[in-house]
């Protein structure tokens, strides 16, 4: 094969194998989880302390402030999954999860309300798409509400199974 250079402004019509096209989509992602339980102040938003990187080829996730800084302008898909535990049956009332942009704006929010049938734990997921500019940052937040205590965001399954019960991540989709 020959190498053909395409000048700016030209149109490409390809009948052969295309390589080297694409961009940064394959390397613009991250995933992190929490390695130990985190107790939250009741009915107060707090940042989820996802301190363990599972994947981050661009080194854009900071495990000290739990923040993902966007490397390039685009549309990103994010998710949070986790489990809150009140420690006692019938105590957990509700949980909000949110993704904050640049420290203040709630871009995505999800709520589970157990007020009519109070529970002990609530597994939640939040996912969605956010349009971001290079250098914007996003963080995972939660606000659990308990009848008589401070709920815990669980690092492992509330049913005793080993392995992570929480994760936060995302990737660029466009």
What do these predicted ranges mean?
Residues 9, 15-17, 81, 143:
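Surface loops and adjacent helix of pleckstrin homology
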Residues 22-174:
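Extracellular jelly-roll beta-sandwich "head" domains, especially the C-terminal globular C1q domain
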Residues 1, 5-6, 12-14, 20:
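Extracellular beta-strand solenoids
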